[in-house]
Amino acid sequence: MTDRGTQLQLTAPKLAPAVAVGDSVAVNGCCLTVSGHRGEQLTFDVLEETLDRTNLKRLRRDSPVNLERALAAGAPLGGHFVQGHIDCSAKVISFERTGEDYRLEVDLPADFAHYAAYKGSVAINGISLTIAELLEKSFAVWIIPHTKRHTNIDNIAAGDLVNVEFDILAKYVERMLARSAPHD
């Protein structure tokens, strides 16, 4: 973050040549617009609501982040619809290796629990994952070694905050049911 607290500056040698000012880029799953571009450095304006709702306010110099360009129309979709509209940040309860894979358990904030479903989709720091366990106050996903090596999941630990985006389809279903419910 810059000293103004409303801009995020990142050095992105692989991504920077492929984006321009005005393009959307997901940073830890949060959709941001490139507002400045100089060489390998990208600048993003960050709203206060975004800082309040995400883990971006906790970033420090050299913090690893997940970066991803917006999906182009016609490009293959390899996961679920991730929009970059973070619902909340949630605390990592545990991150443990089991055999060759990794189990990540994350706190499930009560305000969002109705969006979580066993075998449903969720994005954590922008990574499309499947809810493998739905517990009373948390959920767990399994991480394969490739995902761990190629994302910032490799750097998280119990107590860290991750960005969580629940499946948009659950939100649309909720909205449709609310509109079709009889009104008193």
Show which residues each predicted segment covers.
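Conserved loop->alpha-helix
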Residues: M1-D184
